[in-house]
């Protein structure tokens, strides 16, 4: 029996409506604006692999499309710079889990839209074969037998989600149980690439389906990643678009010509610097275009109160930028904790003063009462 694609309305957090209007909303997949979550939610940073044409389509005229998606979903979206000679770019989308999933659903909707003035060009674009094989879809195009409503066939889109290899096994699950459950539950197709992206420890998870269904499955994938505690972050390398060497080997971010800086961060602040799900350190690596390795602690490590952060890049200015931002994050975290400590001490001090004043007042009342009795006795005499 063929797998049927299922259209779905993205899950959304209801917002506090302060304008007196209706709080109901859909998503781009259902014709409305996605509901943006305002309550505290776990945050995630997803990265998508895009072709140059896809990146241009998402950016839009003078950045109008990407700005609209960013504002509508309250997320941070950025696309890597265009590298001469490279056919791919990376889109990063960071925010709370549901908002990020909604934003990516909107991105799928944008990529699905055809130019009605040039249908031939649109068909040619869909069938384009890329030299960089990771841009070529792993999954076959959907057939008429796999959809209930033929008019919705063009609404089915793709996402190339970049995922660290350490998370792939959790998404697939034991004997493929988790990925099968996601496929059956949300009416989508999902497959993981066998090959690693060049000079990285990351692979592609390709998702095919309606924008709303992709949104919902991304929420569950995000939860799997965030709850995955067995993360070997110290050795993982993130993919970034780059040219290959003349020998055919990809340029590695850890070559001998790289600039390298080592920083020792107090163990107490390592978790805050890395961030939940490694979001903070990943954002720093993406923004500065550097590779940052956090060394594991050894049992015989003499500096047990510190952890070593190693920053490398072929551009010295990028390393310096990453170093300054890392130290700034550290100083901000130290200052935040010091301020919190001072507030606690001040609150405890205020409570002590109030108690002392209360005791003093009680003591004075006890002293004054005998004096009043003595005065009364004098008046009577």
UniProtKB/Swiss-Prot annotation:
InterPro entries: KH_dom, KH_dom_type_1, KH_dom_type_1_sf. The keyword Magnesium does not apply. GO terms for biological process: 3'-UTR-mediated mRNA stabilization; chromatin organization; intracellular mRNA localization; mRNA stabilization; mRNA transport; regulation of translation; telomere maintenance; telomere maintenance via telomerase. It is found in: Cytoplasm; Cytoplasm, P-body; Nucleus; Chromosome, Telomere. Keywords: Chromatin regulator, Chromosome, Cytoplasm, mRNA transport, Nucleus, Phosphoprotein, Repeat, RNA-binding, Telomere, Translation regulation, Transport. Gene3D superfamilies: K Homology domain, type 1. Its main location: cytoplasm. It holds the Pfam family KH_1. GO terms for cellular component: chromosome, telomeric region; cytoplasm; nucleus; P-body. Phosphorylated by the plasma membrane-anchored casein kinase YCK1. Phosphorylation at its C-terminus reduces its RNA-binding capacity. Residues 370-381 have a biased composition (Basic and acidic residues). It comes from the Eukaryota. Residues 43-107, 156-221, 258-326 form the KH domain. The modification Phosphoserine is found at residues 358, 360, 362. The keyword DNA-binding does not apply. One of its GO terms (molecular function) is mRNA binding. Residues 1-34, 344-381 are annotated as: Disordered. Residues 15-33 have a biased composition (Low complexity). Present with 15600 molecules/cell in log phase SD medium. PANTHER family: KH DOMAIN CONTAINING RNA BINDING PROTEIN. RNA-binding protein involved in the correct localization of transcripts in the cell. RNA localization is a widespread mechanism for achieving localized protein synthesis. Required for the asymmetric localization to the daughter cell nucleus of the ASH1 transcript, coding for a specific repressor of transcription. Overexpression inhibits translation of the ASH1 transcript. Involved in the stability of transcripts such as the MTL1 mRNA. Involved in structural and functional organization of telomeric chromatin and regulates silencing at the HMR locus. Binds RNA. Belongs to the HEK2 family. This is Heterogeneous nuclear rnp K-like protein 2. The lineage of its organism: Eukaryota, Fungi, Dikarya, Ascomycota, Saccharomycotina. The gene is HEK2.
